[in-house]
Amino acid sequence: MTSTGQDSSTRQRKSRHNPQSPLQESSATLKRGGKKCAVPHSSPNLAEVKKKGKMKKLSQPAEEDLVVGLQGLDLNPETRVPVGTGLVFDEQLNDFHCLWDDSFPESPERLHAIREQLILEGLLGRCVSFQARFAEKEELMLVHSLEYIDLMETTQYMNEGELRVLAETYDSVYLHPNSYSCACLATGSVLRLVDALMGAEIRNGMAVIRPPGHHAQHNLMDGYCMFNHLAVAARYAQKKHRIQRVLIVDWDVHHGQGTQFIFDQDPSVLYFSIHRYEHGRFWPHLKASNWSTIGFGQGQGYTINVPWNQTGMRDADYIAAFLHILLPVASEFQPQLVLVAAGFDALHGDPKGEMAATPAGFAHLTHLLMGLAGGKLILSLEGGYNLRALAKGVSASLHTLLGDPCPMLESCVVPCASAQTSIYCTLEALEPFWEVLERSVETQEEDEVEEAVLEEEEEEGGWEATALPMDTWPLLQNRTGLVYDEKMMSHCNLWDNHHPETPQRILRIMCHLEEVGLAARCLILPARPALDSELLTCHSAEYVEHLRTTEKMKTRDLHREGANFDSIYICPSTFACAKLATGAACRLVEAVLSGEVLNGIAVVRPPGHHAEPNAACGFCFFNSVAVAARHAQIIAGRALRILIVDWDVHHGNGTQHIFEDDPSVLYVSLHRYDRGTFFPMGDEGASSQVGRDAGIGFTVNVPWNGPRMGDADYLAAWHRLVLPIAYEFNPELVLISAGFDAAQGDPLGGCQVTPEGYAHLTHLLMGLAGGRIILILEGGYNLASISESMAACTHSLLGDPPPQLTLLRPPQSGALVSISEVIQVHRKYWRSLRLMKMEDKEECSSSRLVIKKLPPTASPVSAKEMTTPKGKVPEESVRKTIAALPGKESTLGQAKSKMAKAVLAQGQSSEQAAKGTTLDLATSKETVGGATTDLWASAAAPENFPNQTTSVEALGETEPTPPASHTNKQTTGASPLQGVTAQQSLQLGVLSTLELSREAEEAHDSEEGLLGEAAGGQDMNSLMLTQGFGDFNTQDVFYAVTPLSWCPHLMAVCPIPAAGLDVSQPCKTCGTVQENWVCLTCYQVYCSRYVNAHMVCHHEASEHPLVLSCVDLSTWCYVCQAYVHHEDLQDVKNAAHQNKFGEDMPHSH
C-alpha cells in the first residue's frame, strides 16, 4: 500500500500473513570469517528486475496512486523552506461573556492571561501576526446547516432573557449579542492561517481564539461551542486548496464529539481524540467517546478515541498514546494538513480536567506532530480554565512551533496501568484497518519480575505535580554546529583504490552541504585531535600505543598489520586521522554541553562503532561515539544519562561491549543481522543480548533478518520500541552513530531508507534531552546517498520540517517479527513496553468484530452528502433529550448479542447489501449522531423506543453511570451501524425472524453465551441465523472470534497419556460435569470460569497455558488470551473427537 492509498484502496488489510516462529538464537558465537565490504547476495540482479517488471502491468488504480504520490515530490533541492510561525490573536474575541453568570469558566480572562504570558516571554514579536477575519456564511455552510447559522445570526438582536431561554435549550452554553460575530471571527482566524500555510507564507501557526469549537455539531451548539472551527477549516482546505487528507488531533480533556460526528463517515479526515472518559461518567457522557467507536461506513477506522478512565493522567500517558497509536496511523494515512484542537484543560491545576499534564508535555506533543504533513500544522485554542496553566500551556506549544527545543520532562515518563489498558484497547479496535498496527507474535508472557514488585515500582515511580514547573527556553545564537577537517581524507587504502571506505565520502558530504546552503546555516567548529587521556577512557593504553607505531611502518608492514584485524586497512596517516575524527566528536560535545550550539553533526572518518577496547575492526580504529560519551560525562562531572542510537546497517559491536555493564548509557542499535551471518557476524547483535551486570537492559538490539528494510520499518521500530524506551530513560544527551549504509543504493547494506526517512528519524529524537543531539558519521558507501541523507538530517537539526514520505509501504512482516521479539525480551526491563496488565486484556480481545471496509471515495464526503437534514429545525428539537437506555450493559463475551450485532451490521456495511434495506445511514446518523447502540437491549424493550432517540443531530446515546462493581466493564466492537436507533433497526425485518424478544433478553442476561473462555457453553442456533439473514457468502466476511494460527506456547503441549483422553471426566476439584476443560500439559480436568473457575485456578498455580474444551473441542491459551488453531493441536483434538463421538474429526484444518 502506498501513502496515497487512502483514497483508492480499502482500509481493511488485504492479507494477514501468519507470523513464523522466531528462530532460536545460536548460543555459539560465529567466527567472523566474512569481510565487511562483501556485497549482500540477497538483492535481485538486473535481469531478475527486468523480468519482474515486464510481468507486472501497471493497473489504472495504481497509476492514479502514482500520480498523486508524485505530486508530493520536490525535485528541486534548493526550494525555499517556509519559515515563521503564524499567530492570530484579536482583542475583538473578548467582546462576549456570560450575562447572567460572572463565574462562567469560558470568559475573556482566558485570552488576557495568554496575552500577558506571550508578552512576558517575548513570543509575540517572534511570530508572524495575521489579522483575524470573519468567516463567510458560505464557509460555515461547509459544515453547518443554513437554518442553524441563521438561527445563530438572530442572537445578535435578542435581549438577555431571550438569549438565556435559547441557551438553555442546549447543553453547557451561554449566548451574548456578540457571540455570533465572535464565533465567525474565531472560525475565520483559523481559515486565515490555512491560507497562509498553504500559500507558504508560514511554516506553521496558532489561532488563539474563543469561543471554542470542537463540541459544535451540524446544527447544534454544545459545550461552549457555536461553530466547529477545525471542521470548517478541514473542509475549507479540501475545497480551496485541494487537500486530500486532513488529520485532526484533539487533546482537549473533553471529547470533541462534534468533530467526530461530522467526519465519522469520511475517510479523507482522520480524527484522533484523547480525552477523559471515566467509563462514561465524564462529560459528554457518550458511548461514542469510547475506544470502540471507530467510525462507520466508508469512515470506519478513521475515528480514533483514546479514553482516559481515571484522573491524574500525566505527560507519559499522553506521549505513549501518541507513540503507539497516533504516529503509526498518521504515518500510514500521510496527512497533508494537521489541525489540532488545542485545549489545555488537561494541565495540572485545571478545575475541569483534573489531570496532571505539564506545559512541557504539550511541547513534546507539538514536536511529535511537527514531523507530519511536511510540518503543515495549525493549533487552534479550545478549552483550558486554569488561567495560569492555560497561559503556560499555550506558550510552551508556541515555543515549540517556533523551533525552540522541548524542555526535559521532570516526571517519570512511563504510562500508568490505566493508560496502558486504554491504549491497548484502542489498538485492538483499530488493528484491522491499519496495516502499520499489525502486531506480529507479541506474546504477553508474565515477566520474570513478580507482579507485586511491578506494582510496587509503579507506586514508587508515581509522580504527582504540585506546581507547574518554570520551564526554561534557551536562546541560542547558533543552533547547529558542524565539525569537519579535510585532513581526515589522508587515511586511504594504498592497495585498493576502489575500497568502499574512501576519502571522498566526507568530501562529497561537505560539498553537498555547501551546495544546498546548509553549511552556511551552521556554526563551523574547528576539529582537534583527541587527547590520549580521552582515548584511554574507552581503549587500552597498549592498543593506543600499538596503533601509534603504525605511523612509522613501511608499506609492507602496514599491509601485514592490517591483516591482523577484521576488515581493516592501515596507512601512515591512519593513526592521526583516527585521533582527529575522535577529537572532532569530543569538540562537538563540548560545544553542545556548554550551550555554544544546541546540536551538531560531525563529518568524520574513519568510522568508529566497530572499534573494540583492544582492537580495530570493520574500518574502525577509535570508537568516536564511545569516547565522546565518556568525554561528556567527564565534563558534567557525573554519570550523565546518554542515549546512543546506532542506525548504521552494521551492528556496533565495539560500542556495545564498551557500555554493556553501564546503566548510565543506553545503547540502541538497528542493524542487519540475518541470523548472525551479516557483518560483524556472531550473536552479539541478537535481540537476546541485553547487557550484563548493572547494565542489563541497557543494550537494545533490533536485528533485521533480511534486506530491503526501509522507512516504514525503521519508523515502526521508532514508534513501538526506540522512543518509548528513550522517553523512559529520559537522556540528557543523545549521540547518533549515523551510518548511512542502510540508505537506498548503498552497495553493502541492501536496505531502502530514504534521505527523507533519516530526516524523520532525526526529528523524532530531537524531542529528547532538551534537544541536545549530535550526529557522528559512521558508515555509508554510496556517495550520493550519504550526501543527501546527511543533508536531510542537517535540515532537521536546523529546525526545518521533515518532508512528507511519499509512497510509504507498510512495514515488512519480517521487521514486525524482529520488533516484537525485542519488545518481548525487554518488557521485563522497560515498563513503557508493557502495554497492559494481563488481567485487563480480556476486556478488549474477546470476540472482536471484524468487518471488511468499503472502498473509500477518492474525494472527501461533503456534509450535504452525509447528514444534512431537510427542513428548518424546530426550536423544541434543538434541546438535548437524551435518556439512558434500559437494560443491562452488553458484556464482551455474549455470543448472541455480538453475533446479532455482527449480522445486523452485515446488512449495512456495504453499498451492495444496503440496496435491499430501508435503513438510511445518513438518517440514522442524524438521529443518534454516530453513537453506539445496544440493539439487543433495545429489541428487548420495544416500549421504550420513543425515549431512546435524540432530536435531530443530537449528541448520541449517553453512557449511563455504571454501578461501582461494574466500572471496568465496557461495551466492545464498533459496528458500522453505530448510528442506528433501535426503532430503525426494526425496519430490517430481521428481529422478528430471530424471535428476539424475551428470549433474547434472557440470553442477554445469562452467562451461557459468553465467549471469554468456554465457547462450548454457547447455545445459539447458527441455522436460525442463516435462515434469518440469508447466505453470508454473498456479503462481506465477518468473524465473531478469530483464533490465532500460531501460538508461542504450543511447546507446552505434552503427548497424550498412554491411558488416552476422556472428555467426560468430572472436574477434579468440584466433580461437576457441566462444562469442563482439559489441561494440555498435565491432562487434568477442571471446570470453566463460568462454573467454579477451577481451571483458571489450575492455570494460575501451574502456569500451564493451553487447555481444550470438553464441550466443543476448542483450544484456549491463557497467556495469549485467545483461541488457537494449529496443526500441532490436531492429534489431541482428534483423540478428543474420537472419545466424544466415536469417530475421527471430519476435516483436519
Swiss-Prot record:
Post-translational modification comment from the UniProt entry: Phosphorylated by AURKA; phosphorylation increases HDAC6-mediated deacetylation of alpha-tubulin and subsequent disassembly of cilia. Ubiquitinated. Its polyubiquitination however does not lead to its degradation.
Chain positions recorded as Zn(2+) 2 binding sites: 1067, 1070, 1087, 1094
Catalytic site positions: 215, 610
Comp. bias (Polar residues): 18-29, 964-975
List of residues that carry Phosphoserine: 21, 43, 975, 1148
Keywords per UniProt: Actin-binding, Autophagy, Cell projection, Chromatin regulator, Cytoplasm, Cytoskeleton, Hydrolase, Metal-binding, Methylation, Nucleus, Phosphoprotein, Repeat, Repressor, Transcription, Transcription regulation, Transferase, Ubl conjugation, Ubl conjugation pathway, Zinc, Zinc-finger
Region Ubiquitin binding, residue ranges: 1088-1090, 1116-1123
Name recorded for this polypeptide: Protein deacetylase HDAC6
Encoding gene, per UniProt annotation: Hdac6
